[in-house]
Amino acid sequence: MADMSNGEQGCGSPLELFHSIAAQGELVRDLKARNAAKDEIDSAVKMLLSLKTSYKAATGEDYKVDCPPGDPAPESGEGLDATEADEDFVDPWTVQTSSAKGIDYDKLIVRFGSSKIDKELVNRIERATGQRPHRFLRRGIFFSHRDMHQILDAYENKKPFYLYTGRGPSSEAMHVGHLIPFIFTKWLQDVFNVPLVIQMTDDEKYLWKDLTLDQAYGYAVENAKDIIACGFDINKTFIFSDLDYMGMSPGFYKNVVKIQKHVTFNQVKGIFGFTDSDCIGKISFPAIQAAPSFSNSFPQIFRDRTDVQCLIPCAIDQDPYFRMTRDVAPRIGYPKPALLHSTFFPALQGAQTKMSASDPNSSIFLTDTAKQIKTKVNKHAFSGGRDTVEEHRQFGGNCDVDVSFMYLTFFLEDDDKLEQIRRDYTSGAMLTGELKKELIEVLQPLIAEHQARRKEVTDEIVKEFMTPRKLSYDFQ
């Protein structure tokens, strides 16, 4: 563990804090470049955010690169990165914020240049599909998009599109946060009646983690069982392992090479923070995640068509991959993929970071028993309640920081009941223990039902989902 003792006590003046933030930012980048342990990186990021919070408290201003306290701020955002521009740190591997409310998603929309999913777009989706919008849309869990109106234009004009999402299989067991994109993607598949490709990036996990190729592929197959248990239509869904599919699909590999030719090393360093010490596999991997965005990567499904647009539901931290993809697409003659971005599923300890499979106490796993779920929620779920019952009754709880309430916004279908819980908890009529009980009563059957469905997923079913084949959709 790196020595962080120079962080909070040793830096009194704003100028000392300024230099400490710069040094801590360099440490974070160095740890990521050296592939340090996740807990070491997380600890360094937390210290960085703490220093920035102290700096803002001391100066009344956000920390800005190359702008010591007392100097005027730069006129443009040039030179600012995600670590230094504000208090949120978001990339495909790390999500941290100093705010107990979680990431400021409005700022993230501005930073990433995407568009907010507003009421007008939600209503248009409802009109186009004839279905009530999913609770993830109604509640702003999927909050941002790129070109969703184009997808709806295509759908309304009887033009085809397809869905693409994925999973990085880093462990055998998935947690409930991993379900979010798949729950929503299943709904999209159902209401639009379109085919879906699901990429298992076992090659990525081999490159980033201390895994053998066989372990990475094994995790992909095991994770595929959990994904299949979400209820996807076997006649309209193709799940593929990169390690498996790349060697049997010339069309897929040709698109990977096209993308690689049109993205420079300097660009991927700028987008993903790669350094000269990263292996060349990492440098080239973004092209592999980009390739499923183009329909002719799957000739068994789309034949030789290159004009079928793709819609990608994913968490917002994956957007850098697809900003790169959208930049390349017109240069190689393909339509840009559209995207729907979700918020992060918070860790049990609070919304400052997302749930992680590497920390068993921060996660509710899909393999957990009813007893384990109850214990984890009661023991670890961060509360927005007051210190005493008397104070809570008088002042009420804070739903904006309460993890149990956050989880209910993801998994409780009944809007009226959710609103009643919010009112009761905010007013003090409902105590923290009662709120946690509500969550436990939602999570226990949800996970038990998932486990029952997963038991029905045989090796033969997995093989069928993962076999390249024509899907039940006519693209002529």
UniProtKB/Swiss-Prot annotation:
Its main location: cytoplasm. One of its GO terms (biological process) is regulation of angiogenesis. The keyword Metal-binding does not apply. Residues 63-83 are annotated as: Disordered. A motif ('KMSKS' region) lies at residues 354-358. Pfam families: tRNA-synt_1b, WHEP-TRS. Gene3D superfamilies: HUPs, S15/NS1, RNA-binding, Tyrosyl-Transfer RNA Synthetase. A motif ('HIGH' region) lies at residues 169-178. The modification Phosphoserine is found at S356. One of its GO terms (cellular component) is protein-containing complex. CDD domains: TrpRS_core, WEPRS_RNA. It comes from the Eukaryota. Homodimer. Interacts with oxidized form of GAPDH. Belongs to the class-I aminoacyl-tRNA synthetase family. This is Tryptophan--tRNA ligase, cytoplasmic. It comes from Bos taurus.
